[in-house]
Structures are given as structure tokens and as C-alpha cells.
Regions:
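Long, amphipathic alpha-helical stalk/connector segments used for oligomerization, subunit docking
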Residues: 302-388, 394
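A helix-coil-helix interface module used to build multimeric assemblies
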Residues: 1-202, 206-217, 280-281, 291-295, ...
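Active-site-adjacent "gating/activation" loops or surface patches in catalytic cores
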Residues: 208-233
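Active/binding-pocket-proximal capping segment
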Residues: 271, 393-401
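Short, well-ordered beta-strand elements within core beta-sheets of diverse protein domains
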Residues: 162, 241-249, 376-384
Length: 471
């Protein structure tokens, strides 16, 4: 185990469920189930295949001799034929009818479609879990004022909950895209070497209705209601591009959220979970590094970059197909799913344990609120008979002086400066009345309530389990 390379996605980051789904065992069992479905459909539609042969195939689906398959593949240099041979060894009565009329892509491509569909459904649950956590967080802090930033510079007030809805909305868009991909996935079926189904015309004596019915039955067995109308030897590789772009979008949303949390943790406003015995630094014992969010960003970069593989593969299919897609897809597709799974697991863990330091949030608001409130102060002073242009200049001058003082490490004294200006005709009490943070958050609470209400039905049947991360 320690003398050969192992992908960190499998050893450190991805879930046991996703690792099982993309294991060689699941892959070959899926191939065998496809061979069973083919033989059964051919038998039911009149080809000379017996129930005994189909039964023996069904009984041996999980009895896989991987050593035998590896030895055979070394000899014949063909993975599918190696497994046809190995399957026939344990189901000798059916050995002669395995893979009848099919080409390799019958099992490889349909098998991938099944695995990708199941993997997307698994990711969907993780995505919904993150969204549910964020919805609860947004609702909890719907009205807590916090300093908003544009260009990462202090702007107007928002609320902690409203900011979380921005992350939530990104994930909602990802969910919509994922559902679109799932809804439009189709089965390849058993279409022959160039998609013409010529071999089945011979097998079924030219009966095209039987060919269509065979494909319908096989697709239905695996939960697909449609096959692609036309194809070459493979299913359209545009689907791979669509899938990886969907996973990339999830990475983009996770990266954005995690990066925001990292910025806020720097200011000690919000912190990701930190375990009791967790060590932040080998040298600086006091450190509380945002390790989870940093890892989300790191893995998300890989996920976004991985998506570039599929468009290049889809663009070089060469007429009815070429094999130069194979090696790339063996890596880029499973790794994309494993990476998306890892990122969502981390995002679920982080959003389940986000901690808001409300006193620091309030302190930051108090520090900048005098600047934010200057427009309101200006309007109030004008109502009391002041000159708008003169007052604007006073605010500008006092703001610059207060800012210069803050750059020297002193506290903000803008209010005191304005109260001392005769042009304002406002005393300290008047100014304090105009400095209620809740008066500067606009419709944030209302917006949070409306958006959370919109997404809540999505969580109706969600059974969320606490996510543990390995390291």
C-alpha cells in the first residue's frame, strides 16, 4: 500500500460511497448486468437463448475473478474481451451467447452512463445538504447587520443572512443545471460498431421493431426512458462535456463561498469549524487557519481545470469514433466526480458549523456606520435649514480627517467632529438617533425570508447526515 502511488482523492478526500461507485468491482458488475439484460431481451424477442443460460449469467454477476481477467487482458490486449472470457468461465452454459451482437461500447458506454447518472444523484444529495445548511444559517442571521464590501472595501450595510443567500443562490443555479443534465441523459443502447444496428438486422431477420424493443427493454432495466436517436459507436461525448461543466459550476460556487469565509475569518467576523484538539500550525501554536475552506478552494481549482478535458475530447471524435478518448475519460470523468464529491463534503461540513462572532461584527459596523450614515445625516441637516452644498463639503472634510486619524491607529471620531460643526445644527443625541444599524440594511430580512421560503420545498425529503472529513 505504501510502495505505490495512490490518488489523494481516494485516500484522503472522497466519500466511501463515491469510491465504491467508481470501483472496478462496481464497473465490472455493471458490465455483467448489461450482458444479462441483453441476453434476456434477446431471448424474450425470439433469439435462441435459454432461460437456463440467462439464469446462470444472473447468478454469477458478482463472482468476478479479477486475476483471471488481468491475465487474459495481458494476452489479448482488450479489457472487454478479457471480461467476456472471465464471465464465460464461471457461466459456461452461457459462454457462447455473452455479448451477442454487441460491441465493446455496449458495456463500456452504457456502463458509464449508469455510473454517471448514479454519481450525479449522489452529488445532488450533497448539494442539497449544503443548501439546507445555508438556508438555516441565512434565516438565523437574517437581520444581523454587517458591513458590506465592494472591491473588498467598506461599502453599505447588509446582513449576515443576506450575504449567505448570495452563496445559496449560486448553489441553486448549480442544482438547476444538475437537474437539467439528469433530465436529458439518455441511454446508448445496443447499436453496433458504427451505430447502424446492422448486426441486429441479421440476428432478428430484418425485424426493426424488435431491435427498437430490445433497446427499450434494456434501457428500462437501468432506469432510462430514452435512447439517443442517432449515434456512432459511442454516446455523444458532448454529454461528458456537459457533465464536467456542471461539476465545474459546483466547484465555482464552493470556491466563491469558501473564499468569502476565508476573508471574513481574517477579520474574525465568521469562522469555519475548529476542532478542540486541532493544530493550526506546527510553529505558531495560536493559529486558527481556515483549513477546510482553503482545501475547498484548492480542490475546486482542480475541478474547474478538469472540465477542460471533456470539450477537447468531444471535439476530436473522428467520424464514428476514435479511441483517443478512452485513456483521458478513464481519468478525467471519475476524478471529476470524486473531486466534486470531496468539495461538497467539505462544504457541508463547513456550513454545518459556521460560527459568527456577533460582537466583532457589531464592532466593525460601529466603526464604519458614521461614514455610511453621512447621506442620512446630510438629509436631516438640510431639513433643519442647512445648505446642502456647504454640508457636503463639511462631511467630506471631516471624513478625511477622521480617516487620517484611524490610519494612525486611533478610533473613529467622525460623529464628534460633525457635532462640533455649526453648519449641522445636530448635537450628539441627534446623531446617535440616526445611527441605528437596522435602519441601514434595506430589505435584507425580507429578501432572506422570501428566498429561503422559495428554496425550502427542495429539502422536503432530504435526510441529511453529519459529514466527517478525514483530515
Amino acid at each position: 500500500m505504501y510502495d505505490r502511488y495512490e490518488s489523494p482523492l481516494s485516500s484522503r478526500y472522497a466519500s466511501p460511497e463515491m469510491l465504491k461507485l467508481f470501483s472496478m468491482e462496481t464497473r465490472i458488475q455493471t458490465w455483467r448486468k448489461l450482458w444479462v439484460a441483453l441476453a434476456k431481451a434477446e431471448m424474450e424477442l425470439g433469439l435462441p437463448i435459454t432461460e437456463e443460460q440467462v439464469q446462470q449469467l444472473e447468478e454469477q454477476v458478482e463472482n468476478i475473478d479479477f486475476a483471471c481477467a488481468a491475465a487474459r487482458e495481458k494476452e489479448v490486449r482488450h479489457d472487454v474481451m478479457a471480461h467476456v472470457y472471465t464471465y464465460g468461465k464461471v457461466a459456461p452454459k452461457a459462454a457462447g451467447i455473452i455479448h451477442l451482437g454487441a460491441t465493446s461500447c455496449y458495456v463500456t458506454d452504457n456502463g458509464d452512463l449508469i455510473l454517471y447518472r448514479d454519481a450525479l444523484l449522489h452529488l445532488r444529495k450533497g448539494l442539497l445538504a449544503v443548501m439546507q445548511n445555508l438556508a438555516a444559517f441565512a434565516k438565523q442571521y437574517r437581520a444581523l447587520p454587517t458591513l458590506g464590501y465592494t472591491h473588498y472595501q467598506p461599502a453599505q450595510l447588509v446582513t449576515v443572512g443576506k450575504r449567505a443567500t448570495l452563496w445559496l443562490q449560486d448553489f441553486l443555479m448549480d442544482l438547476e443545471e444538475l437537474d437539467f443534465v439528469l433530465e436529458h441523459m439518455k441511454f446508448l443502447g445496443c447499436r453496433g460498431t458504427t451505430g447502424t444496428e446492422a448486426s441486429f438486422l441479421d440476428l432478428f431477420g430484418g425485424d426493426t421493431e424488435k431491435i427498437d424493443e430490445m433497446n427499450r427493454r434494456i434501457g428500462k432495466t437501468f432506469g432510462f426512458s430514452e435512447c439517443y436517436d442517432v449515434c456512432g459507436q459511442t454516446y455523444p461525448r458532448k454529454l461528458d462535456s456537459r457533465i464536467l461543466q456542471c461539476l465545474s459550476a459546483i466547484g465555482q460556487s464552493c470556491y466563491r463561498m469558501a473564499n468569502d469565509i476565508r476573508l471574513l475569518q481574517h477579520d474574525r467576523q465568521i469562522e469555519e469549524p475548529f476542532e478542540k484538539n486541532q493544530i493550526g500550525s506546527s510553529a505558531m501554536a495560536y493559529k486558527r487557519n481556515p483549513m477546510r475552506c482553503e482545501r475547498i478552494c484548492s480542490l475546486s481549482r482542480y475541478l474547474m481545470a478538469d472540465a477542460a478535458n471533456a470539450p477537447m475530447t468531444a471535439s476530436v471524435q473522428w467520424l464514428e469514433r476514435t479511441l483517443d478518448d478512452s485513456a483521458n475519460r478513464r481519468i478525467s470523468m471519475p476524478e471529476g466526480f470524486l473531486c466534486a464529491d470531496a468539495v461538497l463534503r467539505l462544504a457541508q461540513n463547513v456550513t454545518d458549523g459556521l460560527h459568527v462572532n456577533e460582537k466583532i461584527v457589531a464592532k466593525t459596523v460601529r466603526e464604519y456606520l458614521p461614514f455610511i450614515a453621512t447621506e442620512n445625516l446630510l438629509m436631516e441637516a438640510v431639513k433643519r435649514g442647512g445648505d446642502r452644498q456647504e454640508l457636503h463639503e463639511v462631511i467630506r472634510r471631516c471624513s478625511m480627517e477622521a480617516t487620517a486619524r484611524m490610519k494612525e491607529g486611533e478610533s473613529c471620531d467622525l460623529l464628534e467632529r460633525l457635532a462640533a460643526e455649526p453648519a449641522f445644527q445636530l448635537n450628539g443625541q441627534d446623531l446617535e438617533k440616526l445611527l441605528k444599524p437596522e435602519d441601514y440594511i434595506g430589505r435584507c430580512p425580507e429578501q432572506v425570508d422570501a428566498f429561503v421560503e422559495k428554496v425550502t420545498p427542495l429539502f422536503k425529503n432530504l435526510k441529511q447526515e453529519k459529514t466527517e472529513i478525514n483530515v
